[in-house]
UniProtKB/Swiss-Prot annotation:
Protein name, as recorded: UPF0729 protein C18orf32 homolog
Keyword Endoplasmic reticulum set for record: yes
Pfam family, one: DUF4512
Keyword set includes Zinc-finger: no
Cellular-component GO terms for this entry: endoplasmic reticulum; lipid droplet
Amino acid sequence: MVCIPCIVIPVLLWVYKKFLEPIVYPFISPIINRIWPRKAVQSASTSAKKEESNGTCKASGTSITNGSVSRGEEAVPDKKTD
C-alpha cells in the first residue's frame, strides 16, 4: 500500500500550483523582489567556454582506452579445441 502522505502531498502541491499560485503570486512577487533584488550570477570566465567541446573527449597519452590499461598488444588466447 502507498502511504497517505505520498498521495496527499502531490495532490496539495498540484492544487496550489494550478489554482492558488495564480491568485497569491501577484501579492507575494513584490515582497520577493525586495528580498532578492540581485540578478542571476553570470559566468565570468571565458576560458571555460573555450575548453568546452561538442561532446568529444580528448584523450591524453596516459588515459585508459577501451578499458585496457596495458600498453602494446595483448595476447589473444586461442579458442579451446576439443
